Amino acid sequence: IELGMGKKFKWLAKIFAFFGVCVGLFGIGTFSQVNGISSAVHGFFDPNDAFTVKILPFLGEYSWSVVIASLILSFCVAAVLIGGVKRIASVSQIIVPFMAVIYFVFAVILICCNITKVPAAFATIVTAAFSPKAITGGAVGSMLIAMQKGVARGIFSNEAGLGSAPIAAAAAQTNSPVRQGLVSMTGTFIDTIIICTLTGLSIVLTGAWQVEGLEGVQVTTYAFQHGLPFPAQFSSFILMLCLVFFAFTTILGWDY
């Protein structure tokens, strides 16, 4: 910001850096990712809170799976971050493609197993978006809620409009800014157009979006359990593994 807009905008660069740290630490960079990992692990190993521990009186009780997962996560993040950008890159370039391919394969299997429902699923998506109920709801004030949810989902999906992409692009070691720009755009395309579309379609195909009482990770878990031709426990394990490693690499990138 300082080099591009001039030294008189140095204050703006400092504000950008401050809020970037806040978002990375208290927002989508760390806290929400840790919560996602804890929810996934808790839902798989101890969904009924059969074993709980009390760390401090004012913190309440937590499932043993959450405590152990948090300790392991802290150790792994520290071990990678101490190695600097090279270790982060070497770990991420192994984990991210591997887990993306696994998630893609299982999501495609789910869709193929329910291929006859795909036309109806797309019809449901379109009709629900443009139904009189949706239009009326928007007219009476639900539009603001829809926009809020949409912006939140968009930021969590690919961080569009957040301003975080330049941070990662600036840290990249490349001789071609054009190539780096293409890499940044490719990441957004893969994340939103491919991964998120597969996830949304899986949720609609299995009817997980209509099940009451499910939130967040639980919705996708239900879709994988009921849509894949594998034992429910195995499907849940695959999803948990993907979520844990995706969130782990996100923490590495933001904390660095």
Can you annotate each of these PLM segments?
Residues E2-K8, W209-L228, Y256:
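Flexible loop linkers connecting adjacent transmembrane helices
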Residues F9-L25, A69-I72, A134-S157, I194-L198, ...:
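Select transmembrane alpha-helical segments in multipass membrane proteins
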Residues N35-G36, G163-A172, S202-V204, Q218-Y222, ...:
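Re-entrant/interfacial helical elements at transmembrane boundaries that shape
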Residues A78-V80, G154-A160, S164-P177, S184-T188:
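Helix-loop junctions at the membrane interface of multi-pass solute transporters
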Residues A100-Y103, L110, S202-T206, Q233-Y256:
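Hydrophobic alpha-helical segments of multi-pass membrane transport proteins
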Residues F106-T124, I135-G138, A171-T174, T186, ...:
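Extracellular/periplasmic helix-exit of transmembrane alpha-helices
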